[in-house]
């Protein structure tokens, strides 16, 4: 008797490497919880129309690493609808703006096809928002708005801009994201007061040498285009703080990039970079460097001079080693992602290289050993992801990792967990799925802060009674093991919301399961020896997902099973000693 009332997700997919970074981008999954890529933010609008914005979807894959934009956020859409404005209505808005002498006009999300030429009369405007319309061109009259400082044109169908815009001598922010530009309009290079320029998600193939004419530029975002190279003149942008060239087709960077010494955020992820210039070491203000999903095989030693660096993401390249003592030189580094590379050993440099690291992700490499003492100075290390490596054991000083909060050791070849796991008193998340564990240490019960314990796909035949001490546990995954029984102490886990017991050899469930008052998801599927459910299960009033497929539950009528958890609980109440609760 079976029921498809809910299944646990399989999180064990591996992401094979292939030569092309673009192909790897499609296949590889991001590391959960480590180094997520964030969305580029939107320009802010104010006033009564501020709820009519539109959220921009992220082109990035799941996890981690980061977007380096330092932008301002635009409003959320009102009820997800687009305002439809006739020409008369738009003209009315323009007239109102003129009469009230408003300095700000928001015509975003109005399905506007053509902006009336009468806009030229609004010479007092300093902010004009036209994003998320259907504009294919701008009237030349926009060039009359000589006081304009902000012009937001994202999410239209613009293919060019009128030359008259070069009259906008005060323009500081220009947003052209999500249009149909095949090149950066020549007039843009003449807007020498620009400090912020957004060109994300167009069809731009090149940045011209004329970019040197934008000396005040502090933020330049040209991610998600088709740019194959940057001109040497990019090095003349001495005020540049944020440079986002992610999701393009770059193979090299000009050495002149080293002249942009004010850069703090540099996002180069999802390109085809084969190397980095030594001059990158000149970026003494660099705070975040995103290089994930490229084709790098080495990192220049000069990067050690970027002493302000806090986040370094090298995920999914072809790197097998780092320059010796590189990490020790990066004295402010707190987040390091080396996932999906070719490391067989930990980076050379000794314990001091991890003294400032908060999060270390080395998922999907070929490491077979964590060196003894490597984390002896890692007093702030809270997140360690060693998923999908070749570990067969853990170091003898494993129990000294007292600052660890999240530890992922999934998809290795571990046969045992040391008893001194009891020393990891700060641990909240422990992932041990897809290993070769036959039993768990009694010291596990000392992890009183544990919220999530994942032991899926091991060879466990029983659980220690000490598991009853994990009273903060919310998620316990024991799927695909060899369990025949559960300890009665399972009933002490009253904060449990998710319990995965599918694909085991359970013969029964303890009646104490009825004390799991917060249980919402229970997976019992594929237990061939489970013939009945305890009446106490009826006490789990919050249960909303229950999988019992491929279990020979002969006492449950098929129509009850088909009705889902609420029917099953009702049936157990009627048939058992809890019928008074019906």
Swiss-Prot record:
A motif (RVxF motif) lies at residues 63-66. LRR repeats lie at residues 101-122, 124-145, 147-169, 170-191, 193-215, 216-237, 239-260, 262-283, 285-307, 308-329, 332-353, 356-377, 380-400, 403-424, 426-448, 449-470, 472-494, 495-516, 518-540, 542-563. Residues 1-29, 36-57 have a biased composition (Basic and acidic residues). Residues 1-90 are annotated as: Disordered. Keywords: Cytoplasm, Leucine-rich repeat, Nucleus, Repeat. GO terms for molecular function: protein phosphatase 1 binding; protein phosphatase binding; volume-sensitive anion channel activity. Component of the SHOC2-MRAS-PP1c (SMP) complex consisting of SHOC2, GTP-bound M-Ras/MRAS and the catalytic subunit of protein phosphatase 1 (either PPP1CA, PPP1CB or PPP1CC). SHOC2 and PP1c preferably bind M-Ras/MRAS, but they also bind K-Ras/KRAS, N-Ras/NRAS and H-Ras/HRAS; these interactions are GTP-dependent and both SHOC2 and PP1c are required to form a stable complex. Interacts with PP1c in the absence of Ras GTPases. Interacts with M-Ras/MRAS and RAF1. Interacts with ERBIN; disrupts the interaction with RAF1 and Ras, preventing the activation of the Ras signaling pathway. Belongs to the SHOC2 family. This is Leucine-rich repeat protein SHOC-2. The gene is Shoc2.
């Amino acid at each position: 008797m079976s029921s498809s009332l809910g299944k646990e997700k399989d999180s064990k997919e591996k992401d094979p490497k292939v030569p092309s970074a673009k192909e790897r981008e499609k296949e590889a999954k991001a590391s959960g919880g480590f180094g997520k890529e964030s969305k580029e933010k939107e320009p802010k609008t104010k006033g009564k129309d501020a709820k009519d914005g539109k959220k921009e979807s992220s082109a990035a894959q799941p996890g981690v690493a980061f977007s380096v934009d330092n932008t301002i956020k635009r409003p959320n859409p009102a009820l997800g609808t687009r305002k439809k404005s006739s020409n008369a209505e738009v003209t009315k808005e323009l007239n109102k703006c003129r009469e009230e002498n408003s300095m700000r006009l928001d015509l975003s999300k109005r399905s506007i096809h053509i902006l009336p030429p009468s806009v030229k009369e609004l010479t007092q405007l300093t902010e004009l928002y036209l994003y998320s319309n259907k504009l294919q061109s701008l009237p030349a009259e926009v060039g009359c708005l000589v006081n304009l400082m902000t012009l937001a044109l994202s999410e239209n169908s613009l293919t060019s801009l009128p030359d008259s815009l070069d009259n906008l001598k005060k323009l500081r922010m220009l947003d052209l994201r999500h249009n149909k530009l095949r090149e950066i309009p020549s007039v843009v290079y003449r807007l020498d007061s620009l400090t912020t320029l957004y060109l994300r998600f167009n069809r731009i193939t090149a940045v011209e040498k004329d970019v040197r004419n934008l000396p005040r530029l502090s933020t330049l975002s040209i991610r998600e285009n088709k740019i194959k190279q940057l001109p040497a003149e990019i090095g003349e942008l001495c005020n540049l703080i944020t440079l986002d060239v992610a999701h393009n087709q770059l193979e090299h960077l000009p050495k002149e990039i080293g002249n942009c010494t004010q850069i703090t955020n540099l996002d180069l992820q999802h390109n085809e970079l084969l190397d980095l210039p030594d001059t990158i070491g000149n970026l003494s203000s660099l705070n975040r460097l995103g290089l994930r999903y490229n084709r790098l095989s080495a990192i220049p030693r000069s990067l050690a001079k970027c002493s302000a660096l806090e986040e370094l993401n090298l995920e999914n390249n072809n790197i097998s080693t780092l320059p010796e003592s590189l990490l020790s030189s990066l004295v402010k580094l707190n987040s390091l992602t080396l996932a999906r590379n070719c490391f067989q050993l930990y980076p050379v440099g000794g314990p001091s290289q991890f003294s400032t690291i908060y999060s270390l992700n080395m998922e999907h490499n070929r490491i077979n050993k964590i060196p003894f003492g490597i984390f002896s100075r890692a007093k702030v290390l809270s997140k360690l992801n060693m998923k999908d490596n070749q570990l067969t054991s853990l170091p003898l000083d494993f129990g000294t990792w007292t600052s660890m909060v999240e530890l992922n050791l999934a998809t290795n070849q571990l046969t045992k967990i040391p008893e001194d796991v009891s020393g990891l008193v700060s641990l909240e998340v422990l992932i041990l799925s897809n290993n070769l564990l036959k039993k768990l240490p009694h010291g596990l019960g000392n992890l009183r802060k544990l919220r999530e314990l994942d032991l899926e796909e091991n060879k466990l035949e029983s659980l220690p009674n000490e598991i009853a001490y994990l009273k903060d546990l919310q998620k316990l995954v024991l799927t695909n093991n060899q369990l025949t029984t559960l300890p009665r102490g399972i009933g002490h886990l009253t904060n449990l919301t998710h319990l995965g017991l599918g694909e085991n050899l359970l013969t029964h469930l303890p009646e104490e399961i009825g004390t799991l008052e917060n249980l919402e998801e229970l997976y019992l599927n594929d237990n061939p020896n489970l013939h009945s459910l305890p009446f106490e299960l009826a006490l789990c009033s919050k249960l909303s997902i229950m999988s019992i497929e491929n279990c020979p539950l002969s006492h449950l009528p098929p129509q009850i099973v088909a009705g889902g958890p609420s029917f099953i609980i009702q049936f157990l109440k009627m048939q058992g000693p809890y019928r008074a609760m019906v």
